C-alpha cells in the first residue's frame, strides 16, 4: 500500500513541491541486483522509477540513513515533483549533516559514507 500512497502524494504536489520521507531502516544492505523492498539507498530510485512508470515526473534529490547510536536508524529521502526543478534546488541536508551513511544525491550514482554493503544476499 505504501507504493500507492507515494504515487498519490507525488500526484497532488504542485510542480516543484517537495516530499520528505522518513522511515525506519535496519538490517543488512545487499544488492542482488538491487535492494528496494526495504528503505535502503535503492529504495528512493525504485520509487522514482515507479512514479515515472505511472506517468509522474519525480526526482530524488537526496536520501540517506540517519545513524542512531541506539540502533533505530531512519531512512530519509527528499523527492521533488517535476525533475526540471531539481537543478534549481541545490541545498541538501547531507551537505550539513555528518551522522549518516549510504547517502545519495541527485545527479550521482555514488553512495556516500557507504556502510553495510554486503556482496551476498542477507
Predicted regions and their residues:
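Conserved SAM-binding loop
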Residues: 1-29
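A structural signal for well-ordered alpha-helical segments within the folded catalytic domains
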Residues: 3, 7, 41-46, 73
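Core SAM-dependent methyltransferase catalytic element
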Residues: 68-122
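Conserved S-adenosyl-L-methionine
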Residues: 53-69
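Conserved Class I S-adenosyl-L-methionine
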Residues: 32-57
Amino acid at each position: 500500500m505504501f507504493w500507492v500512497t507515494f504515487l498519490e502524494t507525488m500526484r497532488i504536489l504542485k510542480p516543484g513541491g517537495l516530499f520528505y520521507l522518513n522511515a525506519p531502516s535496519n538490517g543488512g544492505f545487499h544488492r542482488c541486483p538491487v535492494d528496494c523492498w526495504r528503505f535502503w539507498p535503492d529504495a528512493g530510485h525504485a520509487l522514482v522509477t515507479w512514479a515515472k512508470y505511472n506517468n509522474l515526473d519525480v526526482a530524488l534529490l537526496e536520501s540517506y540513513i540517519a545513524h542512531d547510536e541506539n540502533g533505530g536508524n531512519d531512512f530519509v529521502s527528499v523527492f521533488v515533483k517535476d525533475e526540471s526543478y531539481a537543478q534549481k534546488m541545490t541545498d541538501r541536508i547531507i551537505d550539513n549533516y555528518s551522522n549518516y551513511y549510504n547517502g545519495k544525491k541527485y545527479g550521482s550514482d555514488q553512495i556516500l559514507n557507504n556502510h553495510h554493503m554486503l556482496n551476498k544476499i542477507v
